[in-house]
Amino acid sequence: NSIKARDPAAKSILSIILTYPGVKAVFFHRVANFFHIAGFDLIARIISQTSRFFTGIEIHPGAKIGKNLFIDHGMGVVIGETSEIGDNVTIYHAVTLGGSSPSVDTEKQRHEKRHPTIGHDVVIGSGAQIIGPVTVGKCARIAANAVVVKDVPESATMIGIPAKAVKLENKGKFRPYGVDDKVKDEQ
């Protein structure tokens, strides 16, 4: 029902289960994550890569994902190993939740937080890149093709390269499809 509430094209639960690649990717991730936590990393990676082959969505088995993640259109989404995603998050196609550049000592980096933390009720537009161990506050909106490299405040709307806040209103209010007509540039 959370997908039907966020996607006007969703006609029935059956069509969502059978035809939405994001639903399949999240299901496979939950299975892969189970094996990852249990220490069966190879099995987890095989499940993850099989899911990627069938859905076009790559979610590392180590990523932590909350309830009701909706990946709409999905193709090209990449979610890195130390990513954390809150509840009721919507992600559109070609989004990357990626790590910052590798350090000289990649062994050291294996045990560090390298990917973003996404709060509850966030919407991430198509093509957006959220890079490094940044935090995106709850109810934030990341515009299409924005590049986020710094923390994002709660309820902010971020646009541009690098992303900048254009709106800080309605704190804590969930707006499934984005912004009002009154978008202010706060530069």
Regions found by a protein language model. Name each.
Residues 106-115:
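Regulatory activation segment
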Residues 1-55, 172-187:
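Terminal amphipathic alpha-helical/low-complexity segments used for targeting or macromolecular assembly
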Residues 16-17, 70-71, 104:
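A short, structure-level motif marking secondary-structure boundaries and short turns
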Residues 43, 47, 90, 96, ...:
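Extended, non-globular alpha-helical segments
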Residues 55, 60-61, 66-67, 72-81, ...:
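Left-handed beta-helix
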